[in-house]
C-alpha cells in the first residue's frame, strides 16, 4: 500500500471522519504489528501482555470489518483489510475457512483477470495484482496446514501476471505507464520468490505434475527422475537469473530471501530422491547410485542449513516458520542416519554442527528419557557419532576428549545412568516440546512411518 502513509497521517488529524474501509485497514495493521513483536517487547513498550493486545486489536478489526459488510463487499480497500486481518494468524482454522471467501470476493471484483480497462490507472492495476497473488499465497499456506492433500490447480490463479519487481517508491497514483522493472532485488523480493513457484506451475504442465508428485505423494512409474530433476533445476535457474544475480548478502532481506529460495529447491530435491518415495527393486530395497546418494545427503544438509540461517536471522525470522514443520524432522533423521556411513569431509562437519545446534536448542531431546522418539533419535545419534569418532581418532590422530561435543557426552551419560530403562512403549510426545520442528500437532507418533523412514 504505497500511498497508505499519507492517509494515516491525514486520519490522525481527523479520526472522527476516517472512512470505514480505512478504519478496518488501520486496526488490521495494528494487529499485524503486535504479532511481529515478542512478548517481552510488548510488555516493555505497552505495559500489557502480547495476548491482551492481540485480543483487543483482533476484536476491533472484526468490528471494523463487520461495519463494512466485508463478506459481501465490492470495495477493494475492504478486501485489503480482510486480507491483512487473515494474515495476522495465517495457519488458524478461521483463516483457512475465510481465505476461500476472500478469494471468491476477489474473483467477483475481477482480480483474477488481466484488466485493460482504460479508466483503471496503472497504480490501481498493480495494487489489484499484488492483492490477488497475496490472497493465493495465503491460501496455499493455509491449505498446507489444514488440508495438505488438496490438489492445487494452476487454473485457480487466473491469467494475471506477477507483480512487478519494483519498490513502493517507484509507484504513484497518477502514473499512466508502468515503471521499468529492476534487474536487482527490490522490496518485493521475498514475496516474488514465493509467487514465482505458482507462476512456474501455471506456465508448465510438467512442473505442475512434478509439484503434485513431490507434495501429494508419488505416482510410481509415471515420471522419470531425470525429468523431475530437470524441472527443479529450471525453478532454481529462474531464481538465480531473475532475482539473485545482483543480490547482496549484507542486506538482511536479501540474505533471508536467498535462504528461503535455497530451502525450497533443496526440499524438493530431498523429497524427489528420498528412498521412501521411490520404487523398491527387490526385498523392499531401493537402488541408488553414489551420485544420487550424495545429492540426497547434500539436499538434506542444505535444507537444514538454510532453516538455521532463517530462524536465527535478526530480520523477520518468523517469515521462515511455515517452511519447516515435519519436513525438518525428516531431514534431520536422514542426515543423522547417513552420518553412520559418512565420516569425513566438509559437508559431514557441517552436518554435525547442525545436529549439535538441534540438541543445544532442544535440551528435552536429552533430558526427556520417557519420550520414545527422543530416545530412538539419541541412539541413532550415538551410533553415528561412533563412526565419526573412529575417523577422527584413528584416521586423523586427534584426542577423543578434544573432539567430543558436549551433547554427545550428555547423551552417553544419560545412557550410562540407566535412565533409558524407564522408557515405556509407546508414549505420547510432550505437546510443548520441539515447537519449531513440527511435533506439536501430532497426537501420537506414527511408528510405522518412522520405522519405514529409517529403513535406508
Language model regions located:
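Alpha-helical junction/boundary sensor with strong preference for TPR arrays
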Residues: 65-68, 72, 106, 113, ...
